[in-house]
Amino acid sequence: LDPFAGGSVRGIVAAKLNMPYVGNDLSEAQIRANKANAEEVLGISYPFFPQWTVGDSSQLEDVLSTNGISGDFDMIFSCPPYADLEVYSNDPRDISNMDYAQFIEAYKRIIKQSCSRLKNNRFAVFVVGDIRDKKGIYRNFVSHTIEAFTGCGLHYYNSLILVNQITSLAIRVRRQFNGTRKVGKVHQNVLVFCKGSVEETIDSFEELQVKKALEIFNKSRENSNLHDDVLVFYKGDPKNIKEDFGELHISDELPQ
């Protein structure tokens, strides 16, 4: 189940992995494009052809019922809108149009309805990243996502770091850092939650057939932490950062 379907990629990948997929999105045009893309990539008669629905995910139960989708799901996997970082439409139901407090309220409703359709002893996975407000302060969106799932009774079980391509950040980051002391961000957080009994969930999955690197994972379904989080806080008005710290000067002998 994917309550924030967006584009076609997750549905197509699920089909290639022989997994039934149901994704919902508010945009009818987006869903039409998804179906056309899936037909082009997979063919209309492909087994496990993705199923996309159109509707408001804050009314997800009604959307699923209207489309004749019953029963519970083996997994939730989604990548939600990052509040108003990108506004997708002028539809008042579009949560990217809402202020942050309204966004979080609607976001939690969507997560709650999604989790109600997740089977016991199964996983929910969200790919998220933190976002800044108009003053440049982080909103703590990752933590709000964790709160939304644990508020539904799920266990926060795994956290992974998805490293994105640097692309144009290498060009932009020097001016950005000198002007605001904001570091360039090139990762997202993959948050994994477990519904039900952790022990029974572990026992319900077959072992992955990769030897030493996965011995710990097969025992507990826990990922190994290969990173530390470096959290930076600033006391005062962020507008004064450049004045307080000046520009960062790099020697010509060092890479730019």
PLM-predicted stretches and their roles:
Residues 1-256:
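Class I S-adenosyl-L-methionine-dependent methyltransferase catalytic core
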